[in-house]
């Protein structure tokens, strides 16, 4: 196979429908936000964590406007990379900020993988050794890698099926949890006992990570049907769906667990919240939904981030070596993305991964808005 072919990108135009694109976006968003971040945010801001989710939603809604306007004008598989290129040209700021987004997305992918392991191990009484969580996360990434190799139709079909089951299951959990608890309640702390405003802002920043999955939609621009219309619509639908689901489930968790219990079970707080509300069957149901949600998130994240890196390489913003691998550059970046995700999943814990990811994302997000304003 020629070197030229090795360094060529191949996109399946018109292979993603609007519902399929929405499912890819919500796959990342719902997987990270509900199952991985609820306990982390509660630890930072106390009983006010559902309000931190809402504050993050407001900020992201304003932020999404810039992405929608740019994606309508420049739909591309490069997504963020292409937008930065339009704003800053073929210069260092474009490559630097695009790579921050790339690493942020890979970190989110690893975050989801370890969350998958944490929930799965609750079926077996937890992971006292600490070994099985990363092993299960690594296995999930490898399965998602194989599915991504098999083409967009399969990715869309799997993501859509998982998305429908996941959203239905989470809504059932939220509604039943609130119904059994008898009310939607938060124990608002006294001002003297409330967390510092800085803690609430920190939790809100972490909550933004729960919504940033909408940016993965922008990386599908070359493959979405009628991209100038459907990318913006998919972003709006994804954010609206996540606001509804996050709010509902946040209040359900707060109504069934004390703050101390949420923090103690922060890596699997939804499963813990299901026990008092629904018993052991509810725990198993919630774990199954969590496994589907995080698996769908991994699938969508790998799909989006590998395409963005391929576009950056095509624009000659980052160097590329194919190391003798056959196929298009898109397949090569898929391999590199998976290898990096495997390393992060195996050696970093949830809190470190989340903190690093949000810093990278926020720096890149500021650059996007500054570029639009220029």
PLM regions and their residue ranges:
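Generic alpha-helical transmembrane segments of integral inner-membrane proteins
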Residues: 54, 58-62, 99, 103-106, ...
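Hydrophobic transmembrane alpha-helices that form the core helical bundles
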Residues: 40-43, 52, 62-141, 145-149, ...
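C-terminal membrane-solvent junction of multi-pass transporters and transport-like membrane proteins
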Residues: 194, 324-331, 365-374
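Juxtamembrane helix-boundary/capping and inter-helix hinge elements in multi-pass membrane proteins
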Residues: 44-47, 74-77, 86-93, 222-230, ...
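Membrane-interface "cap" regions at the ends of multi-pass membrane proteins
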Residues: 1-48, 61, 65, 188-191
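Hydrophobic alpha-helical transmembrane segments
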Residues: 22-23, 49-54, 95, 134-139, ...
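Helix-loop-helix junctions that connect adjacent transmembrane segments
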Residues: 3-12, 50, 127-135, 160-283
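TM-loop-TM module centered on a large, flexible mid-protein loop between adjacent transmembrane helices
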Residues: 82-90, 122-126, 236-299, 317-350
